[in-house]
Amino acid sequence: MDKATMQDRQQHIRNFSIVAHIDHGKSTLADRILELTDTISKREMQDQVLDSMDLERERGITIKLNAVELHYQAKDGETYIFHLIDTPGHVDFTYEVSRSLAACEGAVLVVDAAQGVEAQTLANVYLAIDDDLEIVPVINKIDLPSAEPEKVRKEIEDDIGIDAEDAVLASAKAGIGIEDLLEQIVHKIPAPQGDLDAPLKALVFDSVYDDYRGVVLSVRIHEGIVRPGDRIRLMNSGSEYEVTEVGVNSPKPLARDYLMAGDVGYITASIKDIQDTRVGDTVTNAKNPAEKPLAGYREMNPMVYAGIYPTDNAKFTDLREALEKLKLNDAALEFEAESSQALGFGFRCGFLGLLHMDVIQERLEREFNLELITTAPSVTYHVRMTDGTEKKVENPAEMPEASAIKEIREPYVKAQIMVPNDYVGAVMELAQRKRGEFDTMEYLDSNRVNVVYHIPLSEIIFDFFDKLKSNTRGYASLDYDLDGYRASDLVKIDILLNGDQVDALSFIAHRDFAPARGREIAAKLKTIIPRQNFEIPVQATIGSKVIARTNIKAYRKDVTAHLYGGDRTRRMKLLEKQKAGKKRMKAVGKVEIPQEAFMAVLKTDEDEKPN
């Protein structure tokens, strides 16, 4: 293909993402676009086509970004090449959204005609505005009885500050307004820039491991051209490879002769070493390299840490390999090896939030056939020691002795909660119960309020989101950012079973709530841990002080069942023998701890009261 044809092709490319709050209809809209552009036949059509993981379909959420090439015959008679990148909407996966947007020139903003602008809508659209993307607003679900498109149009203009006069009125489910949207994409979103003659510069925005092809890199070509047979260099690691295949997803992989500036596609180069590739890296030509790499992505720091252990210690290496492969496909995941007296060898993993942790655990179990135990998630604490040194503690079991600690600082978040007027009281009560400090309250219109609180991250990570939804009948929406560290009066609570400390059950709590939490957890463990043949004392301690104790009663086998009549000394002898046996068992007995016990540490009775 000559240069003029390539330049003409570049002018017909449109790269865009779809961004929205959870459940506003992104994936359904993507389905309709694929259908209308004949990218996928009616026979192959299924709901959430771009959500390729079973897990995404089951939960009805998008977890991974997904890029696909479509061809659209516009009303001006020209054929345009669309690269559509579907993105997640949940706060835990904001990182996936920011990576998708870096590969685009425009963003389609989907807002539910009944729900209006919500917290994640704002968070995601601001990411797009920061990247200078052209925004095409779509008001979706206009066929719902509760739809108020004009009110939502005004919200988009007032809350986000973008012109919504031409906003597309659509119903992705019914297929209304999809053609208008495609025409707006053609006319509003600019074609990509990029010099075809310059040295190759391609940004890696995702990668996945394929057993046959090695690492498959998802790239946005910013400058130059790449073809099979080219020698490429990954600028971050300096490793060089020969390209075996380039292509696009449509939505299945289609090999191409080349990828050029403006294209979004994939490159394979028989990369077997997972450590060589990193999301945010720049791919260039080894013989004619670019001088400077592209600006990558800011590294995401994990918010939540938890231990993941194989139930069978022999599977430790399998777990390491599985985590390495997942890290390719999920750049925000962090892990390092650790050991626990109770659970053996495993990994301390860092996640962006609880949903992220849940998804990783489920993917490890499904995709790699592993049986795992996950400990209760915790956050990173900054501990200042009496000798002046600082220590970061990600695992409560590693918290130093209280006598050696000067102060403990915990991470706080700035939580923005958008809520209807009627539920402001319920939200404020919940935030205060979670040790939140009130910051500001802003009335967005006559019915909606944006409440801002500073809340310890440890109080948010477990069930704050669920509580918020149930206390406001699902109307409130939440977005939060890390807001530095603050000193708090915190203590470590250890759990002892049968006199032995179970390091994986240790947790950190505020001193004021520690005795109550200790009692609740001891009582909870009593119901969760199965009864044994001997009595098990369950104790919660702070240092050497026991703050709660309960006993798990033993099973009792009737050893005298076969006796009838006769001398009672025979009966007493058998009962004494049983007692001695139980005593011996108690001395050497190991207590089996089920998975629910680790999560019980986080749930408190106060949380479980019906709202």
Swiss-Prot record:
Coiled-coil regions, chain positions: none
EC number: 3.6.5.n1
Places the protein is found: Cell membrane
Record's protein name: Elongation factor 4 1
Domain of life from the UniProt record: Bacteria
Reported function: Required for accurate and efficient protein synthesis under certain stress conditions. May act as a fidelity factor of the translation reaction, by catalyzing a one-codon backward translocation of tRNAs on improperly translocated ribosomes. Back-translocation proceeds from a post-translocation (POST) complex to a pre-translocation (PRE) complex, thus giving elongation factor G a second chance to translocate the tRNAs correctly. Binds to ribosomes in a GTP-dependent manner.
Matching SUPFAM superfamilies: EF-G C-terminal domain-like, P-loop containing nucleoside triphosphate hydrolases
Organism: Lactiplantibacillus plantarum (strain ATCC BAA-793 / NCIMB 8826 / WCFS1)
Reaction catalyzed: GTP + H2O = GDP + phosphate + H(+)
Residues the record lists as binding GTP: D23, H24, G25, K26, S27, T28, N140, K141, I142, D143
Upper taxonomic lineage: Bacteria, Bacillati, Bacillota, Bacilli, Lactobacillales
Residues in tr-type G domain copies: 11-193
